[in-house]
């Protein structure tokens, strides 16, 4: 099913490329766009993950320079039956994370320093379990290729203004160029939404199964969403086509309930996880807003053998009591 979905998305993006090419240069422009699309498909398959990691200035870490973070990913990968992915750290105060790679054998997960500093051990585990769920479902290939294509289509639409307005072989003239500038990026955004909004719910569900407790992830989503609203991510702002790769939309000030958001509503995702927690516990009453203390009231079935610590005050400027508050050393020095 994932292979079919990937093929359909590639076909849709290729059709967008060809449509823009036709609007710019008629049948000749369409054929050139087809060749560009074919090259982009091949390049995306082999290199899109490297591009995404590079755009976010992610640095690979291991058990020596990020022992706790690496150990979390290692334990969760074992729990999920996955190969150990390459593990990256993004030097950014906004709490966020993403996964990339063409298959589980070539996957990578990345978390920001803001995520490690602001979330508890259990919440970090839940976030990385969510990312590993994307790897397990092979969403990473689809999402990475779509991100690369969306950026390329947006650039092609912008180039249409300069390249297509006065060409004799442009069958629609300036009207066609305007259509290429407006319709192509919008259509690419629609495809991004089709990928991200449905896959996030499924990754939430599977991630909660991997880490053993849905409320850990619910609490993490709440903290990340509040952090993303007020802490900018300059790298994501420069490359908005990557936004749907992250667990929470990283674009500063983005309204999560917007009709055209790349992510489903955070409140809806939290509600789904609360319902899942009730089902796992066999309860019937509505669950309150999740906290790590509540999550620890029953032993998880995942790789974590003890109850989580109490939640810190909401969105502290500097963490007071979590595993990352002991000044762990990363590739660029101490994180806190």
UniProtKB/Swiss-Prot annotation:
Pfam families: Peptidase_M48 (PF01435). It is a multi-pass membrane protein. The active site is at 131. The chain crosses the membrane at residues 7-24, 29-48, 145-165, 171-191. Keywords: Cell inner membrane, Cell membrane, Hydrolase, Membrane, Metal-binding, Metalloprotease, Protease, Transmembrane, Transmembrane helix, Zinc. It is an enzyme of class 3 (hydrolase). This is Protease HtpX homolog. It comes from Mesorhizobium japonicum (strain LMG 29417 / CECT 9101 / MAFF 303099).
